[in-house]
């Protein structure tokens, strides 16, 4: 029946025809949207890290036609570029040198699609608590769309490798996974990596279909080129994810023979080089390294005071950190241990992880599914190892989380194998599916029933304050002449739409920066003032005459922090007018700022 012409045909079309299928899809879409809105309403609290905010700011810069630049002035970036004879210019933003570009580019695309008037209104309006910043809601919408896309691709991969029930179970498990939702509402770009890895395995599934076909040489080369391009996009989304190219080369070398092998290898290599080449060339031109300053992550480890990545970025030095093999091994083993003991099980797949692991002992009857399971096992090992070694530990996009949809597909496949071998449960497949999805959904149900959160991450981010700091400089006609410095510079850049220097750990770097641009405002948030040493400083009775002993105990900034308590900042410190907004929130103004216009 092409289209119903009578009421009876229409009813039949709705009950058993194509209309019934459309109704089921519409109902599923409505439930998915309703679930998404509920979880987002209760769990969304804006970007939670400087890394995410930095990438959001870079995306906005790309959308504005400013290229891959950032409003965040890292002292390390300033030092590296100055060593290459690029001087600081208050009218020209620094290039972004610490992160892969694909998520910012995706953000730029989402911003560009919005009407300009609406976009500017959302990006400039000060939020009224508990509502959030308009730009944060745009990031949330983007990540929701990416998660829905990942769910559709999960269904498709499960259906093509096994059967529709497997795809439905895996997609449902993804949409009911609390870890997937935590990554989504954190707007850190994890769903983008899910989409890319799922697309890569759909291409691998297509290659399995072509592997035994006659006269498939040209199509094999084309599909391998698509695979190489997708792996290149993974590299541009997360540098360590680019190591999947090793698995792609290994698959092409082992799966094909003779001329087809060389065509497959050439397709992967050519496409990977074409996708990644321009970005690598840009990084080499700016810094001399293929991944720019992200290459330092090999030697850095979050939480290690001697190799803290934040300290490296905020230090005015162009010197690369030395690689200590003992520290590298310790970092790698610690991260792998955390992946295998915790993230693999709590990373989204949960119960299906157990079915996936148990399935290693069982060969699937379908050859392509069996081969791709081992391809994925190799990919899982390579990606976990690469992220553990090459990342500093700051990332929010853990491989164990964005690989979870494929774990779910193979776990669901083995689940139905077990179901079919059980005489009792095999009679009730839908009930068994519902029970498994119910267990998967329990943590998410708990989160969805919580009351609404504040829709921005305070502390330390307060969008209205950051916007007010920019307006203060505008009122004094000091934009560009004086800069802003903050311990959360990406927050100031994203919410305040103004360039901000990152607070250096050394006072001498602070004074060196003031020679390039006088600092008009310094923001100290709970990120700094709630640290244990400041709490200890706050608890001690401090006398003005005792300030000289403070720096030895509390670091170079100790005298400044002590001055916030006593009201007696050092005379040589240029930001001598502190404004106390809360016990752990200060804005220090420079008395040299011009007076407010009109006064």
Where are these regions (language model features)?
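Transmembrane-helix signature of polytopic, membrane-embedded enzymes
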Residues: 118-133, 149-176, 194-195, 424-430, ...
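Signature aromatic-anchored transmembrane alpha helix within multi-pass, membrane-resident enzymes
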Residues: 24-31, 165, 172, 220-229, ...
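Hydrophobic/aromatic-rich transmembrane helices and adjacent perimembrane loops
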Residues: 183-184, 190-194, 234-237, 243, ...
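Transmembrane alpha-helix segments characteristic
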Residues: 29, 169-170, 174, 226-231, ...
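Hydrophobic, aromatic-rich transmembrane alpha-helices
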Residues: 154, 249, 253, 333-373, ...
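Perimembrane helix-loop-helix junctions
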Residues: 5, 9, 208-210, 243-273, ...
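Membrane-embedded, lumen/periplasm-facing catalytic core of multi-pass transferases
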Residues: 43, 430-491, 504, 526
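Multi-pass, polyprenyl lipid-linked donor-dependent membrane glycosyltransferases
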Residues: 138-149, 169-176, 180-207, 211, ...
């Amino acid at each position: 029946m092409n289209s119903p012409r009578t009421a009876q045909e229409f009813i039949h079309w709705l009950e058993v025809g194509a209309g019934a299928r459309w109704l089921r899809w519409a109902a599923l879409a409505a439930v998915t949207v309703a679930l998404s809105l509920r979880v987002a309403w209760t769990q969304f609290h804006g970007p939670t890290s400087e890394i995410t905010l930095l990438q959001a700011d870079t995306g906005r810069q790309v959308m504005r036609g400013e290229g891959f630049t950032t409003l965040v002035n890292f002292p390390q970036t300033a030092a590296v570029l100055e060593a290459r004879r690029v001087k600081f210019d208050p009218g020209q933003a620094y290039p972004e040198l610490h992160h892969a570009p694909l998520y910012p580019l995706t953000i730029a695309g989402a911003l560009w699609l919005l009407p300009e008037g609406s976009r500017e209104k959302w990006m400039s309006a000060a939020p009224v608590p508990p509502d959030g910043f308009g730009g944060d809601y745009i990031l949330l919408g983007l990540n929701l769309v990416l998660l829905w896309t990942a769910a559709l691709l999960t269904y498709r991969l499960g259906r093509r490798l096994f059967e529709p029930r497997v795809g439905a179970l895996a997609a449902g498990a993804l949409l009911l996974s609390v870890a997937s939702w935590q990554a989504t509402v954190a707007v850190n770009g994890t769903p983008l990596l899910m989409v890319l890895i799922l697309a890569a395995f759909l291409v691998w599934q297509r290659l399995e279909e072509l592997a035994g076909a006659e006269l498939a040489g040209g199509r094999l080369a084309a599909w391998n080129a698509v695979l190489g391009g997708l792996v290149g996009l993974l590299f541009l989304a997360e540098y360590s994810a680019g190591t999947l190219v090793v698995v792609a080369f290994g698959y092409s070398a082992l799966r094909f023979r003779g001329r087809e092998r060389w065509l497959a290898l050439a397709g992967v290599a050519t496409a990977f080089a074409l996708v990644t080449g321009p970005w690598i060339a840009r990084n080499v031109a700016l810094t001399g390294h293929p991944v720019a300053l992200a290459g330092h992550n090999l030697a850095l480890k979050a939480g290690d005071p001697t190799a803290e990545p934040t300290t490296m970025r905020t230090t005015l030095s162009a010197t690369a950190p030395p690689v200590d093999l003992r520290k590298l091994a310790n970092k790698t083993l610690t991260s792998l241990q955390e992946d295998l003991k915790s993230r693999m099980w709590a990373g989204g797949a949960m119960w299906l992880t157990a079915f996936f692991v148990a399935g290693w002992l069982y060969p699937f009857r379908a050859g392509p599914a069996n081969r791709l399971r081992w391809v994925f096992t190799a990919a899982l090992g390579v990606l976990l190892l690469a992220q553990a070694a090459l990342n500093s530990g700051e990332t929010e996009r853990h491989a164990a989380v964005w690989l979870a949809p494929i774990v779910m597909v193979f776990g669901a496949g083995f689940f139905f194998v077990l179901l079919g071998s059980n005489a009792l449960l095999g009679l009730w497949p839908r009930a068994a599916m519902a029970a498994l999805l119910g267990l998967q959904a329990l943590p998410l149900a708990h989160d969805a029933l919580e009351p609404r959160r504040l829709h921005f991450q305070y502390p330390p981010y307060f969008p209205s304050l950051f916007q007010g700091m920019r307006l203060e400089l505008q009122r004094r006609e000091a934009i560009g002449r004086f800069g802003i410095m903050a311990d959360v510079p990406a927050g100031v850049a994203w919410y305040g739409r103004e360039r901000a220097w990152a607070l250096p750990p050394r006072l001498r770097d602070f004074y060196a920066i003031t020679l390039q641009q006088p600092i008009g405002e310094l923001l100290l948030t709970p990120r700094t003032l709630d640290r244990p040493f400041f709490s200890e400083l706050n608890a001690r009775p401090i006398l003005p005459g005792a300030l000289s002993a403070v720096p030895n105990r509390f670091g170079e900034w100790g005298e400044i922090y002590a001055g916030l308590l006593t009201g007696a900042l050092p005379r040589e410190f240029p930001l001598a007018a502190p404004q106390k907004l809360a016990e752990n929130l200060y804005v220090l103004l420079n008395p040299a700022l011009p007076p407010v216009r009109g006064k």
